[in-house]
Regions:
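A detector for short, charged/polar N-terminal pre-domain segments
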Residues: 1-2
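Short basic helix-loop element that most often maps to the first helix and adjoining turn
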Residues: 7-20, 81
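DNA major-groove recognition helix of helix-turn-helix/homeodomain DNA-binding modules
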Residues: 25-26, 46-63
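Recognition helix of helix-turn-helix/homeodomain-like DNA-binding domains
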Residues: 26-44
Length: 90
């Protein structure tokens, strides 16, 4: 599960605009825009959500879910620099 604020933060950490993220995910720009505009949890088809999360994780993003160790609740962070990066991602 990913929230709209997590999605926007993850995209910002990777230095991507909506078009670039859409290309990496194989989704349309309007789909990314709708996901980022969601209230709370991002809505979409299971396939779209899996593509999105997979692309973010390949870029080195770690999603911090509710109940995971974090003083601020849900969030995102970059994995250690030793994690391999996908071509086209920083």
């Amino acid at each position: 599960v990913i929230t709209a604020p997590q999605l926007r933060a993850a995209r910002a950490l990777l230095g991507l605009d909506q078009r670039q993220l859409a290309e990496l995910c194989g989704l349309s720009v309007p789909t990314i825009q709708r996901m980022e505009a969601s209230d709370g949890t991002v809505r979409g088809t299971v396939d779209s959500l899996m593509k999105l999360i997979d692309a973010l994780e390949r870029g080195g993003i770690e999603l911090i879910g509710e109940g995971q160790i974090s003083s601020g609740g849900r969030g995102v962070r970059l994995k250690s620099p030793a994690a391999p990066s996908e071509p086209g991602l920083p």
